[in-house]
Structure formats: structure tokens, C-alpha cells
Curated annotation (Swiss-Prot):
Pfam families: CbiA, GATase_3. Keywords: Cobalamin biosynthesis, Glutamine amidotransferase. It comes from Gloeobacter violaceus (strain ATCC 29082 / PCC 7421). The active site is at residues 328, 424. CDD domains: CobQ_N (cd05389), GATase1_CobQ (cd01750). Residues 250-432 form the GATase cobBQ-type domain. Belongs to the CobB/CobQ family. CobQ subfamily. It comes from the Bacteria. One of its GO terms (biological process) is cobalamin biosynthetic process. Pathway: Cofactor biosynthesis; adenosylcobalamin biosynthesis. Catalyzes amidations at positions B, D, E, and G on adenosylcobyrinic A,C-diamide. NH(2) groups are provided by glutamine, and one molecule of ATP is hydrogenolyzed for each amidation. This is Cobyric acid synthase. The keyword Electron transport does not apply. The keyword Methyltransferase does not apply.
Length: 490
């Protein structure tokens, strides 16, 4: 098996998007290619067909490679849940909750074993594996326990690309500093520098690139133009850059940016709707008068509920008279009570919810992770696909109407004002999303949008193609293939 490694000078340098683009470019050339990230820290998770949790970014990369996601592509997922702790997902299943010190002490050896086993599995199935690092490989205080950067590259002997974000400023210094910090055996694997998010005159930049290559001895192999892509962010920091401006929007939908927001990829398809403005509001923000509010998923539902109460946002939501949709943790928050008898989210106890639907939630040891294909009851007969990731079990009052043929997946109030579902990816289903939006439009006296079958995955495929088309002229794919050792096949 051949391998390439992509590391970055910092978080948000563009590693994930570069792996996605390379995956699609090699896939288009007929190469059996797969993505890999040994350890990911993110609250955007995806559930594979086997019921394993992996980072959503690796699922996106798998789709770009023309594959169904598998746990081998991301054997370790860390899901931050506040108080400097994270839930450890090892080989797709929960393994415990711990802080950083305990994690490095207790999970390094089993974690590395999981990484090695996953790589061996991918080696047996694919011609090329494109590995992604995390953060920066130059964190000297963490190198001895690093499971996902140059340790992986050394294990595979993988030629490595170093990507940097020039839009932030200081990119050349970031590259120089990163290379100087790396030990000689790791630096020797860095075969190319990729400049990302460039906008401006390449002629003005070229002297700097020439100096960088001469000073470091590593060639600059790509200068990637700035792209406005709707592919998912890996963590919630990207939400702070989403302003929601859209002049032609006829509907405004507010998503409450919970402190521990999870799976905000649920709103990618909604943001792609030309007639919809999605605005993210923090608990201490002003709700305004949107057409609908969405309470998203949360990695720590009770602390986020308490944050809503303490900030006054809970009172704003209760006083709001429009449509509200709760997804997963958001559904639990909308209910009457949340009971955590064993203290999975901290101290044991029962907490009152917002009380907007008659529903009680109890947190239990068993975590449900599964893909779902189900028929919708509202609208009737529409096929819907999505996935569940939750620990709580919710009991609904009989006065609530089931949204799906599996009643536990979601309900709506009799006045069609409060909706709740455990189904992540629900809004990716075109017909269901358009029916829901048309109900909002009807309240405003707006004409109905056409309702077509299909799924957001078709739009995602178009984005993969646009990404590959935009970056192919700026990346020496034949050269990368030669570096990886299979030039004759491309």
C-alpha cells in the first residue's frame, strides 16, 4: 500500500479539505484511495453502517473517495464535553471519559494499537491511503504521546505535505518554525509545502515562495486559491465566522449556538437553501423574530440547558411564539425533565427542561449509535435517512404526533409549533426539508417551494467535483503519485 500524509502548521490550515480534494482527484483517476485520521477531536460525529462513531470529516473524505465510511478511517474520536474532559470513542465505541493527563496515560498504548490495526486493515483494501494529521506536528510538549501526526508518517514511511493558511498572515514563518522544530527523521519526510487560502497576486508572492524553498530545502508544491465551499467544518470554531447574510432570503432560521454544540453538520443543507438565512445565536445573544428556532445536538445536554437558563435565552425561547425544532440534545432540552441518575454528565440529578413538549428523558448507560432508514408520517410516506447518536431515552406523551414510522425518532405538537427528533441528518432529506420549510412559508404567506426527492449527498457530490476542478490545476497529482510510489498506475 502507498501512503501520503498531510500535516498543517496549525489548526484550520486546510488539512481536511486538502485530503478531501486529493481523495476525489485520485478517485477520478481510478485509484482505490481511502482517507485516514488516527485521532480526531471533534463534536461532529457520523455513524457508520456498522454503528461505529467516527469524525464527520472522515465520513466526508470517504464520500469524496467514493467509499462508505468505516471505523478504520478514524479509530480514535475525542468528543469534548466541558470541564476539560472528553469522551473517548475507541474503534467506534465509547471507552470512557477523562481529562488530557489521564488520556495520555491510559489510552496512548491501546490508542496506538488501534491506529496500527486500522492502518493494516486499510493497507489490505486500498492502493493509496491519504492520512491527515491534527493541529500541528510541532507541539513539542505532546510529541511523545502524539497518535496522529508524524508518528503515523514514520510508521508508514509516508511522504508528507505541510499545509499552511496564508490568509491569517505569517504563513512563511509558520512553515519555517514548524520545520525547525521537527526532529531530523520527521523533517526528512516533509516533501512539499502547500500554501492554502491564497487570494491576491501570485507574482507578488513568488519571491517569498522562492525564498522559502531555498531556506528550508523543501519545495512549494501548491498554492491553493481561496474557496467558498459549503463542506462541513470540523469543529464549532467555524460557526463564529458564519454571519448568515443572504440578501435574497425570505425565511430566517436561528440556530442556538449551544456551548457544547454537536453535529452542526445537520444544518449544511439548510444553509444551502437560497431562500433561507441561517443565523447562529449564542446563549447570551438576542433571539429576534425569526421564522423558526432550532435547538441543535449537544455533547452535554444538561450543562447546555443550565447555560440557557442562566443567560436568559431559555426565557426568550419560552416566550417565542413561532416554530421550534429540537434535534437530539435539543429535543431533550425542549421536554419536561431530564434525569441523569448515574451522573453521566456530571452530578446525578433531575433537571426541568424548557417544558415546551410533554417528554421526559432519562440518561442510561447504553449509547445508541445507528443508521436509520424510515418512513415519515409527516409528511406522510416520504422515505427518510439519517442516524442516531444519543445516550438518553425519551418518553413522549400520547398527545404528541409521531413524525416517523418508528415513533421514538421524533414528535410534533398538535399545533405543529414544536418539533423534536433524534434523527441527525434529517434536514439532508430534500423532500422532508422542503415540506418543513413550506410550512414556515405558509405561515408567512409565501409561495410554496417545489418539493423534489433526493438527498443532500447529490449536492455534496457536486461540491467534491467543484473542489477537485478548482484545485487540480494547482496540485501536481502525478508528482504526488510518484512520491507515494505508484506513478505508473495514474
Amino acid at each position: 500500500m502507498a501512503a501520503l500524509m498531510v500535516v498543517g502548521t496549525s489548526s484550520h490550515a486546510g488539512k481536511s479539505l486538502l485530503v478531501t480534494a486529493l481523495g476525489r482527484l485520485f478517485h477520478r483517476r481510478g485509484v482505490k484511495v481511502a482517507p485516514f485520521k488516527g485521532q480526531n477531536m471533534a463534536l461532529n460525529a457520523y455513524v457508520t453502517a456498522e454503528g461505529h462513531e467516527i469524525g464527520h470529516a472522515q465520513a466526508v473524505q470517504a464520500w469524496a473517495c467514493g467509499l462508505e465510511p468505516s471505523v478504520a478511517m478514524n479509530p480514535i474520536l475525542l468528543k469534548p464535553q466541558g470541564n476539560m474532559t472528553s469522551q473517548v470513542i475507541l474503534k467506534g465505541k465509547p471507552a470512557g471519559v477523562c481529562g488530557a493527563v489521564d488520556y495520555y496515560r491510559d489510552y496512548f498504548e491501546p490508542g496506538w494499537q488501534a491506529v496500527v490495526e486500522a492502518l493494516a486493515e486499510l493497507q489490505s483494501q486500498y492502493e493509496l491511503v491519504i492520512c491527515e494529521g491534527a493541529g500541528s506536528p510541532a507541539e513539542v510538549n505532546l510529541r511523545h504521546r502524539d497518535l496522529t501526526n508524524m508518528r503515523v508518517a514514520l510508521h508508514l514511511g509516508a511522504p508528507t505535505l505541510l499545509v499552511t493558511d496564508i490568509d491569517r498572515g505569517g504563513a512563511l514563518a509558520h512553515v519555517v518554525g514548524t520545520l525547525q522544530v521537527l526532529p531530523p527523521e520527521e523533517r526528512a519526510l516533509i516533501k512539499g509545502i502547500v500554501i492554502n487560502k491564497f487570494r491576491g497576486s501570485l507574482a507578488l508572492l513568488q519571491p517569498g515562495l522562492d525564498w522559502l524553498a531555498q531556506y528550508t530545502g523543501v519545495p512549494v508544491v501548491g498554492v491553493l486559491p481561496w474557496l467558498e465551499m459549503a463542506l462541513p467544518e470540523e469543529d464549532s470554531m467555524g460557526l463564529f465566522d458564519r454571519r448568515g447574510a443572504r440578501k435574497q432570503a425570505q425565511l430566517e432560521i436561528v440556530v442556538i449556538r449551544l456551548p457544547r454544540i454537536a453535529n452542526f453538520t445537520d444544518f449544511d443543507a439548510l444553509e444551502a437553501e437560497p431562500s433561507v438565512r441561517v443565523r447562529y445565536v449564542s446563549p447570551d445573544g438576542y433571539l429576534g423574530h425569526p421564522d423558526a428556532i432550532i435547538l441543535p445536538g449537544s455533547k452535554a445536554t444538561i450543562p447546555d440547558l443550565l447555560a440557557l437558563e442562566a443567560s436568559g435565552m431559555a426565557a426568550q425561547i419560552r416566550a417565542y411564539g413561532g416554530v421550534i425544532l429540537g434535534i437530539c440534545g435539543g429535543l431533550q432540552i425542549l421536554g419536561s425533565t431530564i434525569d441523569d441518575p448515574e451522573g453521566f454528565e456530571g452530578h446525578p440529578g433531575r433537571h426541568p427542561g424548557l417544558g415546551l413538549i410533554e417528554a421526559t428523558t432519562v440518561f442510561e448507560p447504553l449509547k445508541i449509535t445507528r443508521q436509520v432508514q424510515v418512513e415519515s408520517r409527516l409528511p406522510a410516506g416520504e422515505p427518510v435517512v439519517g442516524y442516531e447518536i444519543h445516550q438518553g431515552q425519551t418518553t413522549f406523551a400520547p398527545t404528541l404526533e409521531a413524525l416517523f414510522a418508528e415513533p421514538h425518532l421524533g414528535v410534533v405538537s398538535s399545533n405543529r409549533r414544536v418539533w423534536g427528533t433524534y434523527l441527525h441528518g434529517l434536514l439532508d432529506n430534500h423532500a422532508w426539508r422542503r415540506h418543513w420549510l413550506n410550512a414556515l412559508r405558509e405561515r408567512r404567506g409565501l409561495p410554496q417551494l417545489p418539493v423534489q426527492s433526493g438527498h443532500y449527498r447529490e449536492q455534496r457530490e457536486e461540491m467534491f467535483e467543484r473542489l477537485a476542478d478548482a484545485w487540480e490545476p494547482h496540485l501536481p497529482i502525478d508528482g504526488f503519485a510518484q512520491l507515494a510510489g505508484f506513478a505508473s498506475q495514474v
